[in-house]
A protein has these predicted regions:
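Early extracytoplasmic/lumenal segment of secretory-pathway proteins
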Residues: 1-57, 191
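Extracytoplasmic ligand-binding site segments that recognize negatively charged/polar headgroups
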Residues: 3-7, 44, 49-55, 59-195
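Periplasmic-binding protein-like
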Residues: 167, 172-176, 213-239
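Mature extracytoplasmic/periplasmic domains
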Residues: 229, 238-297
Length: 323
């Protein structure tokens, strides 16, 4: 699971009503999840929360089981736009339910930036040498590709770059390395970097914004003028699960409006079930863009299946290894 998706604030009720224990193993990237599923430990997991860049591959690879949607009646309440996407639909079968979605925003320390930076290019400013953090994930590759203009005219091109384009992305990221204090792998790691004043800029998640504000840290979050990538997390049942009936009941519980609101309270992410909005204040709806969701969609380039994922990872690993 991604961090925040098995918080006791909302899993405890399911545990009590179903006389079970929800035990989470958190992941730091989509590739980490795929490695766990393929590495012989798939039977350790009943439910997974893959993002939209690997959900299709997991479905096609037989790592998830087709869902019986009659056992998940709340599925029909989920956003029609999200349900219409082909990400988890293979051969007429549905392998996952949309759960949460959101952006990969630019996070900044407001004591260093009274006004929100308006471009991802700020990460490369020599003024912030050693004060930047980026995610150990292909999202960093996508972000550099955006700055190089590879999202125009088709943002989907970010997920199918040519060898030449990937080499240019690599050069761009190598230019960033002097500014990078640390490449973060978990949400808690980035939260600590900000709280310890080790960094003032980072690509992050709304979860970190939520956590830092709860801790009293003055963090800002923005989507720069280049826009940003975004993700749709799905809940799936692993093919190796020995508790498929219980897992189906868990999926049903997790997409119900009240649970979705509780997950949003923990993570700051946008719920896949619009009915969760009835439990929110006007400010909460505004902060999640639920009143202008169609416009918000246009600012996010949702992750897609990456046909040449191994090549992307090779480029990213070369960037990380460079001195």
């Amino acid at each position: 699971m991604w961090e925040g998706y098995a918080d006791p604030k909302f899993t405890k009720e399911f545990e009590e009503s179903h006389h079970c224990k929800v035990t989470a193993s958190y992941m730091g990237s989509s590739d980490e999840l795929v490695a766990k599923l393929r590495g012989g430990s798939a039977s350790n997991y009943d439910v997974i929360s893959p993002s939209s860049d690997v959900a299709t591959m997991i479905s096609k690879a037989g790592l998830a089981t087709p869902l019986d949607l009659t056992k998940i009646p709340t599925y029909t309440q989920l956003s029609p736009q999200l349900r219409a996407l082909p990400l988890v639909k293979i051969g007429g079968k549905t392998f996952g339910v949309p759960f949460m979605w959101g952006p990969d925003p630019l996070l900044y320390d407001t004591s260093a930036f009274p006004n929100a930076p308006d471009s991802w290019d700020i990460l490369w400013d020599p003024k912030y040498k050693g004060k930047v953090s980026v995610w150990d994930d292909l999202s960093t590759v996508y972000m550099a590709a955006q700055l190089l203009g590879y999202d125009r005219p088709d943002p989907g091109q970010l997920y199918n770059l040519s060898d030449e384009q990937l080499e240019n992305v690599k050069k761009k990221l190598l230019e960033l390395k002097p500014n990078i204090r640390k490449i973060w792998a978990t949400g808690g790691e980035l939260t600590n970097l900000f709280e310890n004043h080790e960094v003032v800029l980072a690509m992050g998640w709304p979860l970190m914004t939520n956590d830092l504000r709860k801790h009293g840290f003055s963090i800002g979050e923005t989507i720069p003028k280049e826009n940003t990538t975004g993700w749709i997390d799905h809940l799936m049942i692993t093919a190796a699960s020995e508790h498929k009936e219980l897992a189906s009941e868990f999926l049903e519980y997790m997409i119900q409006p009240k649970t979705q609101k509780a997950v949003t309270d923990v993570t700051g992410y946008v719920p896949a079930n619009p009915a969760a909005a009835q439990f929110m204040t006007a400010d909460e709806r505004k902060n999640l863009h639920l009143d202008d969701v169609d416009l918000y969609y246009q600012r996010l380039y949702f992750w897609q299946d990456v046909p040449r994922r191994d090549k992307y990872n090779q480029i990213w690993n070369e960037v990380k290894a460079a001195q």
